[in-house]
A protein has these predicted regions:
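A short, proline-enriched helix->beta-strand linker immediately N-terminal to the Walker B motif
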Residues: 170-174
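A short, surface-exposed alpha-helical micro-motif characterized by mixed small hydrophobic
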Residues: 218-220
Length: 245
C-alpha cells in the first residue's frame, strides 16, 4: 500500500478576468506522505492558497481547474459532491487564514464546532461538547465553556484563529490543509500551535500541507518545502536542502 496521502499531477487553475483567462496555478505536481509536513513557501499572490483551495474544490465558479488530484488513491475531481462532502471537514480539513469569514457570524462558536463533529460522527451532543472543550484547551483558549458560548465577533482575532484551528482538528483529519495558520497569533501561541501539529503527527500520523510566507515557520515544521512563485513550483525538496541552497 502506497504511503502517499495526497498527490497532484499537472494541476492548473485559471480564472476568467473580463474577456480572458488568467492562470494562477501552473502545472503543479506535488505529493505528500502520511505523517509528513509539506510547506509551500511563497510571497502573497504566488498561487499557493489557490492551489490548496483547488484541492478542496472551493474555488469560485469563474475558476477552471485541470490536472489530477488524488487523496488516498481516490480521484478528488471525479467524486460527486456528496462523496466529497464526506471527506471535506472530516478526513481532509482546512484552517483558513481569515478566521472571521471561516465562522458563521449568526451562530455561537461552540455550536458550529459541535455540529461539525456530529455531522461526521455518532457522538451525542454532550460528547461533542466535551470534545470541543478538550480542543479549546489544546489550542490555548482559556475558559473553554465560556468561549464556546461566544459569537465570532465577540472574540479577538487571535482567539478566533485558535477556534478555527480547533474546528479543523475536531474530526481527527488524516490530512490538514493550513493556510497561514499562525499569522494572527502572538509568538507564544504560535509556538504552542506548531508544537500541537507536531504532536498530532507523531500520535495520529496526520499529514499537513501548509502555505506560508514565513521561512521561520517553514523551518520549524516542514519535512519538505516547495518554493512557489507566479503559480509555478520553482524548487521542491527536503527542508535543509532547500533552505541551504
Amino acid at each position: 500500500m502506497s504511503d502517499i496521502i495526497v498527490k497532484t499531477t499537472e494541476l492548473c487553475a485559471d480564472f476568467k478576468i473580463k474577456d480572458r483567462m488568467v492562470r494562477a496555478v501552473n502545472r503543479v505536481s506535488l505529493s505528500l506522505e502520511r505523517g509528513k509536513t509539506l510547506v509551500i513557501l511563497g510571497e502573497s499572490g504566488s498561487g499557493k492558497s489557490t492551489y490548496m483551495k483547488a484541492l478542496l474544490r472551493i474555488l469560485p465558479k469563474t475558476a477552471a481547474v485541470e490536472g489530477q488530484a488524488e487523496f488516498l488513491g481516490n480521484d478528488l475531481f471525479r467524486m460527486s459532491e456528496k462523496e466529497f462532502r464526506d471527506i471535506r471537514g472530516n478526513r481532509m480539513a482546512m484552517i483558513y487564514q481569515d478566521s472571521l469569514s471561516a465562522l458563521d457570524p449568526m451562530y455561537k462558536v461552540g455550536y458550529q464546532i459541535v455540529e461539525t463533529i456530529r455531522a461526521h460522527s455518532s457522538l451525542t451532543k454532550a460528547e461533542a461538547r466535551e470534545r470541543v472543550e478538550e480542543l479549546f484547551v489544546k489550542v490555548g483558549i482559556p475558559s473553554p465553556r465560556e468561549r464556546m458560548n461566544a459569537y465570532p465577533h465577540e472574540m479577538s482575532g487571535g482567539m478566533r484563529q485558535r477556534a478555527v484551528i480547533a474546528m479543523a482538528l475536531c474530526c481527527n483529519p488524516c490530512l490538514l490543509l493550513a493556510d497561514e495558520p499562525t499569522t494572527a497569533l502572538d509568538v507564544t501561541i504560535q509556538k504552542q500551535i506548531l508544537n500541537l501539529f507536531l504532536e498530532l503527527q507523531e500520535s495520529d500520523r496526520m499529514s499537513i500541507m501548509m502555505v506560508t510566507h514565513d521561512i521561520g515557520v517553514a523551518a520549524q515544521v516542514a519535512d519538505q518545502i516547495a518554493i512557489m512563485y507566479g503559480g509555478i513550483i520553482l524548487e521542491c525538496g527536503a527542508t535543509r536542502q532547500v533552505l541551504e541552497t
